[in-house]
Amino acid sequence: EDCFVPWERVFLAGEWQHGGVLALLFALFHRHSYSGCKPAIGDIVLGTAALAAEVNNIHKASHVREKLAEIILTTELGYAAGYTASDLGKPEVYMPGVGFVPYGPGSYIPHSIYCNVGRCLTGEAVFREAEILCDLAGGVVATFPHEKDFVNPETGPQLLRYTKRNPEMPVEDQAQFWRYLGDILCSATGGIVNVGNYHGGGSPIMEQIAITTQYDIESRKKLVRYIAGMSGGDRDALAKALPWTSRKK
């Protein structure tokens, strides 16, 4: 505390608020990047789910369509939130206890609400997507014979015969797919990846805290007060709160 620090090496001199902003910005940019990263993983999950149904020869079933649509919805909504966060970016930051304030110089910061919405939405879906893969695959991913049994001349021909699910697909491709999906669903690495995808960038509860802390809930209450004929209502409250209404043309 008593050491001499040259002024050119002083970054903060009593502006303690920037310390909190630094932590918030780290999380914010991480969550923004997640809104691009996780949709890309969603593309892999979607392709895996579609192939699992095809290998099992159930790809025309209605429940498969529903599951694929669910993955697409989550993927594209997460991407849309990240894209919107970029489009609504401004040189401003949310400062606890103060609200959104100009922050620079010149760095455009993605919109906090949409960063958190995209991260929370796609993060919460991680284990649901794993459940869909497990459901479409069946138990074969956990019980599939070892590869050495397929090259064994005594057991190989019978294994190829009895593990064939779709007559329109080469059985060798089917076997290779189940090994691939087994690595995703049944391996230690697969489990670690799922936990990382769920908590990376901040657990969902952290996004929920950020969203409800920073979102202008009061303006929505004022609008409903106006609609309901209560005192303290404001028909224009929501228009004042929407981020795109305050953008510079």
Task: Briefly describe each language-model feature range.
Residues 69-91:
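Loop-to-helix element that buttresses phosphate recognition and phosphoryl-transfer chemistry
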Residues 43-44, 56, 80, 97, ...:
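Long, contiguous internal "core" modules enriched in hydrophobic/ aromatic residues
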